[in-house]
A protein has these predicted regions:
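Radical SAM enzyme core and accessory elements
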Residues: 1-13
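Conserved glycine-rich "GG(E/T)P / GGGxP" loop and the immediately following alpha-helix
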Residues: 13-145
């Protein structure tokens, strides 16, 4: 039996129905409100596509789509820095998973937007974190140059 096989946790009577996957370990910003601004940076690595596919398969083996169907890339990273990110979204689409995407927007490519337009049925949430429209304040907040 998979080590993932366990009852879904309950919190105030609600079952969690989302899995969070860190597809890469880095971010291109150092926002003052994020641990990335203060922690020792992790090595810049992206999850192998085969490992990602294995994780999706294991989740689907243990949980039905009604039990767990959403994947979030909402960790302290920028998911779009992963060169295989669109491939991972294609795997998720092919296996019927929904995804939640939070990005600082800096690495959104034409390839990604074209994919999202063609497959809107798998987008649960797509959020951009743009802390201000003022350029100086934006640089101060994000640590960008």
């Amino acid at each position: 039996m998979s080590e993932l096989a366990r009852p879904l946790p309950e919190f105030h009577g609600f079952n969690y129905r989302i899995a969070q996957i860190e597809n890469n370990t880095h971010c291109n910003y150092k926002c003052w409100f994020c641990p990335n601004a203060y922690d020792t940076p992790a090595p810049k690595e992206c999850m192998d596509l085969d490992l990602f596919a294995k994780i999706l398969t294991e989740i689907r083996t243990v949980y039905t789509p009604l039990e767990l169907n959403d994947i979030s890339f909402a960790t302290y990273n920028e998911p779009n820095l992963d060169d295989t990110f669109t491939d991972k979204l294609q795997l998720m689409t092919a296996t019927g998973f929904m995804y939640e995407h939070i990005s600082n927007g800096s690495m959104i490519t034409t390839e990604l937007t074209d994919f999202l337009i063609k497959h809107p049925q798998n987008i649960k949430n797509f959020r951009l974190n743009i802390p201000t429209l003022d350029e100086k304040k934006w640089k101060d907040i994000t640590g960008a140059s």
